[in-house]
């Protein structure tokens, strides 16, 4: 056997073993291992191995992007029943953005599994954020095709959803959403907002709102609209609760 073929065979054996260990780590065994390998195959690797029937991960990335948006949207819709469409959209965007996907990929050492061309390898492609985010999406696409939506949901329940529950994305929420997220995480009870007062002429109205948790006042706020007053009340409540933590 020529040395080059021997080296390539040894390389592929090493990666197959790595993929086996990876599947054991995540507790999922692919029915079609080719899909798993394709998810981690960068176009630069395909370009350097044209004689072999390799496919890059770009189509899987396209599919995974859509599956990720759907599953995260469903999770947020169920978890935050009173959150507005705008806030849900903003929160979802923070979860599926490149830095977040890179964080998820790094947590599972995706970079070490990527099949790269020599040029991409030499320029640090294994650690390039855009590449890692693409691989994470491609993996979700491959997992969906191989196992279905339920398995994707189970995987995200282990890797992504706990970070939402831990407040990793609270910074993109408005005050009311942050307060709701904090209370839900703590399991403390129900939040209610009450407008205590309306004053001033019709063209310059001022509202005073109070937010309560299990009938205990947490904060007061005022504003030119009911929404603004509630936001300010939530901001005061958040400040108090965080001081107690």
From Swiss-Prot:
Residues holding Mg(2+): 61, 134, 137
EC code: 3.1.26.3
UniProt-listed InterPro entries: dsRBD_dom (IPR014720), RNase_III (IPR011907), RNase_III_dom (IPR000999), RNase_III_sf (IPR036389)
Reactions it catalyzes: Endonucleolytic cleavage to 5'-phosphomonoester
Record GO cellular component, one term: cytoplasm
SUPFAM superfamilies: dsRNA-binding domain-like, RNase III domain-like
Main EC class the enzyme belongs to: hydrolase
Record function comment: Digests double-stranded RNA. Involved in the processing of primary rRNA transcript to yield the immediate precursors to the large and small rRNAs (23S and 16S). Processes some mRNAs, and tRNAs when they are encoded in the rRNA operon. Processes pre-crRNA and tracrRNA of type II CRISPR loci if present in the organism.
NCBIfam families assigned: RNaseIII (TIGR02191)
PANTHER family reported for this sequence: RIBONUCLEASE 3, RIBONUCLEASE III
Full protein name: Ribonuclease 3
Organism: Bacillus cereus (strain AH187)
